[in-house]
């Protein structure tokens, strides 16, 4: 899996949304 700023941002937003 490639870690990209945009990808990381999406993951973080999803985590925050589910938190």
UniProtKB/Swiss-Prot annotation:
The keyword Ubl conjugation does not apply. GO terms for cellular component: cytoplasm. Its main location: cytoplasm. It is found in: Cytoplasm. Keywords: Chaperone, Cytoplasm. Heptamer of 7 subunits arranged in a ring. Interacts with the chaperonin GroEL. Together with the chaperonin GroEL, plays an essential role in assisting protein folding. The GroEL-GroES system forms a nano-cage that allows encapsulation of the non-native substrate proteins and provides a physical environment optimized to promote and accelerate protein folding. GroES binds to the apical surface of the GroEL ring, thereby capping the opening of the GroEL channel. Belongs to the GroES chaperonin family. This is Co-chaperonin GroES. It comes from Clostridium pasteurianum.
């Amino acid at each position: 899996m490639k870690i990209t700023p945009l990808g990381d941002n999406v993951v973080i937003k999803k985590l925050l949304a589910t938190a």
